[in-house]
């Protein structure tokens, strides 16, 4: 059986990992064994945080809606309850954007929610 020398393939594999580790600090960018571990860990963080990002944005939207609702004399939970009773189907992302960029329109939405609760 012929002998298989893996020099070219191993070098390509190493360079691929080292390229992914570009920008890392110290040995994490220079030494293959350390760089490989760093790249794997970075992938785990990226996977986890792609999911956490969705939670974080929802929390941000809710905080913004709550602040704007309180400026109009209403709490977040009563506001959302009023919207559901009024049949207003606007998601939190859009409500947050309206609250930040168009206070008058948000006040009108709050009035609809108040009317539905009364």
From Swiss-Prot:
The gene is rplT. It holds the Pfam family Ribosomal_L20. Keywords: Ribonucleoprotein, Ribosomal protein, RNA-binding, rRNA-binding. One of its GO terms (cellular component) is ribosome. PANTHER family: 39S RIBOSOMAL PROTEIN L20. This is Large ribosomal subunit protein bL20. One of its GO terms (biological process) is translation. Belongs to the bacterial ribosomal protein bL20 family. It comes from Hydrogenovibrio crunogenus (strain DSM 25203 / XCL-2) (Thiomicrospira crunogena). Binds directly to 23S ribosomal RNA and is necessary for the in vitro assembly process of the 50S ribosomal subunit. It is not involved in the protein synthesizing functions of that subunit. GO terms for molecular function: rRNA binding; structural constituent of ribosome.
